[in-house]
Amino acid sequence: ITIPRCLNFALSSDPGYFAACFSDIIKAQGGAVRLANFMYGSYTGLSWTMFMLIPSFTAMFGRSALPQIAGAWTLGNRNEFERKVTVVLRSNFVIGFPLYLGLSAMSRQILEFLFSGRQQEVSVSATSLFILGLGGVFLTLSSTFISIFQVIGRSDLPVKLMLPGCAVKLIFNVFTISVPAININVAAVSTVIMYAAVALGGYFALENVTGIDFHIIRRMAVPLSAGVVCAVVSRIVYGFVGESVNAVAALFLP
């Protein structure tokens, strides 16, 4: 609700900026009055949709261990509990980090490949998807922590962690989206900040509740490094074969 209103405020405060940067979109939409809704729709329809595909995918790999985590916690078997939690953390890190960082590195190219007939939406959404991809590291952490809290009977903790994060996101949106130069991209930044806050709180809460040091930072190092390598290599490879990929895609995608 707040994002379109803040965008409209930014549009009214500096119409010249938007007229210069989004002139083609304004013409296609029949006037600047529809620009805010167009930008918000592009963000939610493209950037957010692509971003949320990955947690749906990664959740499948760690979900099988959750009943075993609950059983080990109920029986008080600390060693088995630590081992199963470590399995979930590693699987989510190994799969999630490369996917998110690769999505960030290839944000515009992925959107252009999948939505080749919607170039105006892509132009609005590409930067937001780049930012969201970087923040996927925090989403991977926070979603893992929330799943663990739920299976050990601490369903109150996700709520306690999410409420401050959502409050920060709301405040950040209200005061920054209305700045014309950054506009809709702030929605992605505020989302990353929210997940970072939830991940940080979840990190300390998990160790405080369980009394176990899971060495999470150390376990993140290798998957995170692998994700960075994947992102860099994808950019390099695309530089060589990008035109060929686009040509082939044009034959099959509308």
Feature-to-residue mapping (PLM):
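Membrane-interface helix-loop junctions in multi-pass transport and translocation proteins
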Residues: 156, 164-200, 214, 232-253
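Hydrophobic residues within alpha-helical transmembrane segments
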Residues: 50, 94, 131-134, 160-168, ...
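Alpha-helical transmembrane segments of polytopic membrane transporters and translocases
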Residues: 18-58, 90-94
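Helix-loop junctions and terminal segments of transmembrane helices
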Residues: 55-77, 82-85, 146
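Alpha-helical transmembrane segments
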Residues: 142-153, 202-219
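Interfacial segments at transmembrane-helix termini and the short loops linking adjacent helices
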Residues: 37, 86, 103-136
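Membrane-interface junctions at transmembrane-helix termini in multi-pass inner-membrane proteins
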Residues: 134-164, 175
